[in-house]
Amino acid sequence: MEEDFNIRDHQLTSRERDFENALRPLSFEDFNGQDKVVDNLRIFVKAARLRAEALDHVLLHGPPGLGKTTLSNIIANELGVGFKVTSGPVLDKPGDLAGVLTSLEPNDVLFIDEIHRLSPVVEEYLYSAMEDYRIDIMIDKGPSARSIQIDLNPFTLVGATTRSGLLTAPLRARFGINLHLEYYDDDILSNIISRSAGILDVPCSSQAAGEIASRSRGTPRIANALLRRVRDFAQVKGSGSIDTEIANYALEALNIDKYGLDEIDNKILCTIIDKFKGGPVGLTTIATALGEDAGTIEEVYEPFLIKEGFLKRTPRGREVTELAYKHLGRSLYNSQKTLFND
């Protein structure tokens, strides 16, 4: 029986997070890929250490699963300071933010994931914390209300977002270091898979690692998740070692095609072709037709489909490309003929 694998599996459960943490590099030396980003961070971190001061605030942005959390942890490790993690949706009110900020030791790193989802009132409190290392808190209500100023230890805020366009200009301006993470090439992903296989103590040939890498959508998190699934097939259907044959068998069973597209990716393309004659069509309409969340399609699936040339954005909406027709075995001519006959 086939088991579908889709990208939403990587909104990590606690067990999956433990697995990912076991594979997470802890230093710049061990981090594969993102060479320009890592090289710049090495310089910034070393300079901050030489001056014995907090590193400038860092904004990391790019698609999910490319290493934003990992790099944040590495920054703290390389600085030799504490590392605290939270996320935009968790910081619901100013008191939540104040509790986190006042717990920081000098020069600690505070990582806020999904920083674009901070509420406006919490974001405003963050401004003075980032600029002046202080916050103003209101005590009591009504006529007896008063503001007290709380001084904070110097700290580095590392904000991560998959949707940098949603950040307000005032918040973006307060990050002294702004870095974009790109998708990884297959050679780098193959190295990551081989390293992870070694940590998991599962033999994996370089050819098999390359095969898994080629279907990992340029994303280390997906590469490690696929390795975990292929390991299951190797233990149950094979000898326990991962070779090209068992890798291909597992990936086919998981409905991951040679481009790394899963069932949802192909449904998106098929829906645009079959129901909307290839487009253009609006994102909300696509989401409604699929019964999916528009934000998930835009954030998780669409970037890779556009990068690989299966989909394009136009002022009038999304359109599939000729490559998508070829990939799905559909006729572009028939679709256009139907369009003009309507």
From Swiss-Prot:
Catalytic reactions of this protein: ATP + H2O = ADP + phosphate + H(+)
Q: Where Mg(2+) is bound, by residue? A: T69
Cite the residue spans of the region called Large ATPase domain (RuvB-L): 1-184
Q: Which GO terms describe its molecular function?
A: ATP binding; ATP hydrolysis activity; four-way junction DNA binding; four-way junction helicase activity
Enzyme Commission (EC) number: 3.6.4.-
User: What are the alphabetically sorted keywords of the record?
Assistant: ATP-binding, Cytoplasm, DNA damage, DNA recombination, DNA repair, DNA-binding, Hydrolase, Nucleotide-binding
Is this entry keyworded Hydrolase?
A: yes
Taken from the UniProt entry, a GO cellular component term is: cytoplasm
Name its cellular compartments.
Cytoplasm
Indicate which residues the UniProt annotation says bind DNA: R313, R318
Q: Which InterPro entries match?
A: AAA+_ATPase, AAA_lid_4, DNA_helicase_Holl-junc_RuvB, P-loop_NTPase, RuvB-like_N, RuvB_C, WH-like_DNA-bd_sf, WH_DNA-bd_sf
Q: Could you tell me the superkingdom of the organism this chain comes from?
A: Bacteria
**What EC class does the entry list?**
hydrolase
Any single GO BP term: DNA recombination
Q: Where are the stretches annotated Small ATPAse domain (RuvB-S)?
A: 185-255
- Per the annotation, which location comes first and is thus the protein's main one? cytoplasm
List positions binding ATP.
L23, R24, G65, K68, T69, T70, E131, D132, Y133, R174, Y184, R221
Q: Where is this region: Head domain (RuvB-H)?
A: 258-342
Q: How does it assemble?
A: Homohexamer. Forms an RuvA(8)-RuvB(12)-Holliday junction (HJ) complex. HJ DNA is sandwiched between 2 RuvA tetramers; dsDNA enters through RuvA and exits via RuvB. An RuvB hexamer assembles on each DNA strand where it exits the tetramer. Each RuvB hexamer is contacted by two RuvA subunits (via domain III) on 2 adjacent RuvB subunits; this complex drives branch migration. In the full resolvosome a probable DNA-RuvA(4)-RuvB(12)-RuvC(2) complex forms which resolves the HJ.
Similarity section: Belongs to the RuvB family.
Protein's job = The RuvA-RuvB-RuvC complex processes Holliday junction (HJ) DNA during genetic recombination and DNA repair, while the RuvA-RuvB complex plays an important role in the rescue of blocked DNA replication forks via replication fork reversal (RFR). RuvA specifically binds to HJ cruciform DNA, conferring on it an open structure. The RuvB hexamer acts as an ATP-dependent pump, pulling dsDNA into and through the RuvAB complex. RuvB forms 2 homohexamers on either side of HJ DNA bound by 1 or 2 RuvA tetramers; 4 subunits per hexamer contact DNA at a time.
The domain section of the record reads: Has 3 domains, the large (RuvB-L) and small ATPase (RuvB-S) domains and the C-terminal head (RuvB-H) domain. The head domain binds DNA, while the ATPase domains jointly bind ATP, ADP or are empty depending on the state of the subunit in the translocation cycle. During a single DNA translocation step the structure of each domain remains the same, but their relative positions change.
What protein am I looking at? Holliday junction branch migration complex subunit RuvB
User: What is the organism field in this record?
Assistant: Bacteroides fragilis (strain ATCC 25285 / DSM 2151 / CCUG 4856 / JCM 11019 / LMG 10263 / NCTC 9343 / Onslow / VPI 2553 / EN-2)
